[in-house]
Regions:
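Structural detector for short beta-strands of small beta-barrel domains
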Residues: 1-11
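Conserved positions in beta-strands of structured domains
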Residues: 7, 19, 62-65
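Short aromatic-glycine-enriched beta-strand elements
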Residues: 13-18
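A short macromolecule-binding patch
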Residues: 25-32
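Short nucleic-acid-contacting surface segments enriched for D/E, G, S/T with interspersed K/R
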Residues: 34-47
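OB-fold/S1-family single-stranded nucleic acid-binding modules
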Residues: 51-68
């Protein structure tokens, strides 16, 4: 499990990005992966798992939960 902070989120589009605490590259998150909420806000602390998106070659967040 990783932890990080929401750096942007577009509720109208249902996606955004999380900056992981470990300093790695920002991670894409889709609204379908949110647990216990339907939206995120910039600055919120979250926990999440990362999965490599084979099609894009980048990591995305899954099982994202707000900590605050």
């Amino acid at each position: 499990m990783k932890f990080g902070k929401v750096v942007n989120y577009h509720p109208d589009k249902g996606f955004g990005f999380i900056k992981p605490d470990d300093g790695t590259v920002d991670v894409f998150v889709h609204a379908r992966q949110l647990i216990g909420t339907s939206d995120l806000e910039v600055g919120q602390r979250v926990s999440f798992e990362t999965v490599l998106d084979q099609g894009r070659g980048k990591y995305r967040a899954e099982q994202c939960r707000v900590l605050d």
